[in-house]
């Protein structure tokens, strides 16, 4: 049985701590409740906005929509052998807590992704990644409610079309609602230590437990705690450009940090670009780029969505002018009707 609330303050439910009031709100704790809530939205002619951990969203001050807050819990062992486990996890589980649990159980693969904010159900949407690992590498199935077909279904890893910060769930944002995710994790560790200072930090103690510990320490040293400095983590994607364009850039900026990608492309460190453009630690009113990590936009003092847009567009403009590169924001921008807007609107 669903419980419908009205004029609900969403400030506690978005990590940027934006002041947002939703006209309608339902906490969803099962697939049946989700279906019932969607039927209600259809009857009331309301758009349904899916709220997960609120760590990748830019919301307006007023939402005339039905906010569905996904809080589906649970963990089920699907299969286990001597080499691996397959586990089905509720979309409402806190991502970091889930990663800690897998390490404690001796299930390996996700340690590089520790301390990423948000919930399990949101992890496939933008194929979350950090320190050389992406979650899509360990996803077996994504369990969804298909709003077009009005049915529950599973989507294989291959059909998720995972790419850098991308998936089919971004291509069709209104079609699928993720309820559970099935992961395949391994009992023998295969540590990925090639990214940045991770190898140095891990040192001689090359264990999954120490890897996770060092990832957490590195993130805590560079990234502000959203409870102290409201933020959505990395605000901009790292640009991926052609080798030809990169070589031209390298002649003018020989120290630019970069990472080879498939198909003769190169990923550029967006944080370095922002730092070089003078934005690290710089503020415009209530919003600024964090002093320890230029890639993180922070709400310092009760900022509104308009304040956030004003700041990140200034950053985009300066990067475009200096490097001839366009930075694309990671978080999704929503309009007052609960539908996704272009970042440039």
Curated annotation (Swiss-Prot):
GO molecular-function term, one example from the UniProt record: UDP-N-acetylmuramate dehydrogenase activity
GO biological process: cell division; cell wall organization; peptidoglycan biosynthetic process; regulation of cell shape
Keywords: Cell cycle, Cell division, Cell shape, Cell wall biogenesis/degradation, Cytoplasm, FAD, Flavoprotein, NADP, Oxidoreductase, Peptidoglycan synthesis
PROSITE patterns in the record: FAD_PCMH (PS51387)
The protein's name in its UniProt record: UDP-N-acetylenolpyruvoylglucosamine reductase
Cross-referenced InterPro entries: FAD-bd_PCMH, FAD-bd_PCMH-like_sf, FAD-bd_PCMH_sub1, FAD-bd_PCMH_sub2, MurB, MurB_C, MurB_C_sf, Oxid_FAD_bind_N
Catalyzed reactions per annotation: UDP-N-acetyl-alpha-D-muramate + NADP(+) = UDP-N-acetyl-3-O-(1-carboxyvinyl)-alpha-D-glucosamine + NADPH + H(+)
Main localization, broad class: cytoplasm
Pathway given in the UniProt record: Cell wall biogenesis; peptidoglycan biosynthesis
Biological role: Cell wall formation.
Domain FAD-binding PCMH-type: 18-188
Signal peptide, first to last residue: none
One Pfam family this sequence matches: FAD_binding_4
EC class of the enzyme, as a word: oxidoreductase
Family under the similarity heading: Belongs to the MurB family.
GO cellular component: cytosol
Cofactor(s) required, per the database record: FAD
Entry EC number(s): 1.3.1.98
Localization terms from the record: Cytoplasm
HAMAP family referenced in this protein's UniProt entry, alphabetically: MurB
Active site (record annotation): 165, 234 (proton donor), 330
Keyword Flavoprotein (UniProt): yes
């Amino acid at each position: 049985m669903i419980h419908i609330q009205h004029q609900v303050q969403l400030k506690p439910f978005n990590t940027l701590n934006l002041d947002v009031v939703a006209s309608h709100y339902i906490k969803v704790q099962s697939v049946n409740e989700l279906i019932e809530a969607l039927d209600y939205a259809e009857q009331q002619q309301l758009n349904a906005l899916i709220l997960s951990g609120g760590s990748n969203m830019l919301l307006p001050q007023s939402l005339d929509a039905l906010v569905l807050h996904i809080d589906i819990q649970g963990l089920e062992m699907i299969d286990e052998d001597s080499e691996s486990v397959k586990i089905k996890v509720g979309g409402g589980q806190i991502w970091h807590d889930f990663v800690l649990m897998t390490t404690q159980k001796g299930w390996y693969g996700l340690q590089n992704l520790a301390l990423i904010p948000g919930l399990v159900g949101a992890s496939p949407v933008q194929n979350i990644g950090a320190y050389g690992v992406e979650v899509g590498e360990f996803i077996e199935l994504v369990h969804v409610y298909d709003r077009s077909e009005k049915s529950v279904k599973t989507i294989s890893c291959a059909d998720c079309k995972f790419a850098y910060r991308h998936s089919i769930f971004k291509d069709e944002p209104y079609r699928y609602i993720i309820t559970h995710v099935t992961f395949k994790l391994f009992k023998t560790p295969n540590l990925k230590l090639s990214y940045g200072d991770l190898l140095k930090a891990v040192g001689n103690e090359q264990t999954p437990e120490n890897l996770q510990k060092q990832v957490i320490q590195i993130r805590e040293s560079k990234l502000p705690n959203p409870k102290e400095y409201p933020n959505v983590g990395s605000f901009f994607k790292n640009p991926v450009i052609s080798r030809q364009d990169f070589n031209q850039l390298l002649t003018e900026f020989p120290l630019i940090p970069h990472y080879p990608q498939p198909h003769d492309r190169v990923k550029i460190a967006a944080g370095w670009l922002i730092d070089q453009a003078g934005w690290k630690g710089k503020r415009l009113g209530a919003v600024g780029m964090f002093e320890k990590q230029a890639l993180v936009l922070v709400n310092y003092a009760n900022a509104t969505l308009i304040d956030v847009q004003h700041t990140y567009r200034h950053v985009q403009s300066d990067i475009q002018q200096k490097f001839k590169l366009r930075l694309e924001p990671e978080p999704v921008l929503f309009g007052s009707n609960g539908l996704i807007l272009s970042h440039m609107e």
